[in-house]
């Protein structure tokens, strides 16, 4: 499968030298933010270190430099101050908000109370920041438009616009969901001929260019929207918090800015509400002191792009970047499209509006979900965790584009409201509800990406999620109607006295307090600054295996290469308050410092009430893990023991291997009752051997394959009330689950959505 190379070998090498921090990493979230080059930041540092930049309101020299940046940016978009005015803002969102608050939807001679107002029209595929404009625009006529309706205006001859009611159309140059590009010829078409069905309106066009300008050349000499909104970190990586609103000269007549800040007025009276704004458009719109140091830094952003990707063969730097990212996206789309399971079913479901045939219609983004071999979806949160362990950086969810996400996932408004009632909110990690995906995976490319990034992504998906042989283990639904619980019992209890250190197995009984297992995670190792040590940063912590002697109240520290240290667990003083801790002394400090080969460590005991809320107990189904591991060729008992320690499960149960723990709502273990909260989120961590033990690479890969199957191996147990039931948990106790019904709540929600939210759903 061919990849069309845009850069020369020398250019590719120079770009690679600028991003040494990417060694071993594969960053593919450039629609979120692109990356800054190392020389770019050094140049900014040198410029700031060697010059004195004063407040532009105080120093005309700084003001002149800002004007130079402004003119340079206009040239970057092939325009000039004679055609456009560039207003600096905090980003594309602030630019859109400024247009929304300022746009006058009535003719100048019409009072605000007049019903003769124009319309605000937006695409449903717009970013959330555009949808937010609906809340502040000065008109009641707010209409969504389907993309197909907008594109239709290029295919039919519309009337010549003779309307007088100022109206505003907002659409994206490129959809940030999947990089589908809209024909920019629409700008002039709408300006001249309006929209069908709006006979009395005179339309102005606001172009959301935030996604487009990140990897494309926006030619404002050819396409001339009335307003253009963008963020500069999307293009240059640095600085953040800076964007622009470009206003076509002449179109400012329809903007009525209400608020005024420092530097924007010609005269004002402090005792009376009297003021006159500046005649100059830019001065009038830029409230207060602009982030002048950030603005000056844009010079090095432009210099860097023009130096690393110079114009060649008649193409400007940003045009060459556009060609490069499109080639990567096309290569990625085709490579992913070849993935299929052993049973012949496809492994990738794309959410695209094109087939990646031309960069005029498609940008450098590929959006998809992974499908399992039974056709069900892999949740995007699960995918993100696996990707993270492979040093692959992507974006998951809906990317602040509710309209595109809803359309491509086939969700109705009622579905969205039902999901909300069931706990789903924007930005969370709830990726599946009733077997339906709530978001997607987005891969987006920048000028520093390479073909190898795509290959790494495809290899990871192929290794972790594509079945190589048809599984003989039956797939199970996330919600089960029938629970077969014959013979399911508590096999063992694992205690972890010191946070992030190894655990030890209890096969008899152990006390349960309202905060969890007694002594569980009650001790903490801290560094010289008092910061707790965590296992994900200090893997050698797993070589310390503390034990508790409950009869003598001893904490026994063990290490494979050191003598045991026995510490007396003394009764906590009655005045021991929340948030306090007790130092276990110099002997313990010396022992753990030697064991971990770090100086000045201390071992502390924290108050039980300080560990709020009550600790979750991870319950693991041993037989399901064993059966699936055998099916994947993982037969070593040592590997199985390593798994339990790796997941840090507290309760190990055995019984039916096919038991779906996620189908449980509550469970009784002996006489103790618990709430089943959620499935274990540590499964994707199997790629990291935190223990330092010799787990073969083949075993790790086989274990990874286990977790691509739809059989949850662990769930979190929490307290039914404010605290766990106190008493004793005994190994051998039978589990009595309370089943989760066939989602009666969902039916109730579905029936009530139209009545409860009819003021929202139109």
From Swiss-Prot:
Disulfide bonds listed in the record: none
Keywords: Molybdenum cofactor biosynthesis, Pyridoxal phosphate, Transferase
GO biological process, any: molybdopterin cofactor metabolic process
Similarity remark: Belongs to the class-V pyridoxal-phosphate-dependent aminotransferase family. MOCOS subfamily.
Entry keyword annotation includes rRNA-binding: no
Organism for this UniProt entry: Aedes aegypti
Residue span, MOSC domain: 590-738
Residues annotated as catalytic: 400
Cofactors, names only: pyridoxal 5'-phosphate
UniProt superkingdom: Eukaryota
Function statement: Sulfurates the molybdenum cofactor. Sulfation of molybdenum is essential for xanthine dehydrogenase (XDH) and aldehyde oxidase (ADO) enzymes in which molybdenum cofactor is liganded by 1 oxygen and 1 sulfur atom in active form.
EC number in record: 2.8.1.9
GO molecular function, one term: molybdenum cofactor sulfurtransferase activity
HAMAP family documented for this protein: MOCOS (MF_03050)
Protein name: Molybdenum cofactor sulfurase 2
First and last residue of the signal peptide: none
Catalytic activity: Mo-molybdopterin + L-cysteine + AH2 = thio-Mo-molybdopterin + L-alanine + A + H2O
Modified residues (N6-(pyridoxal phosphate)lysine): 234
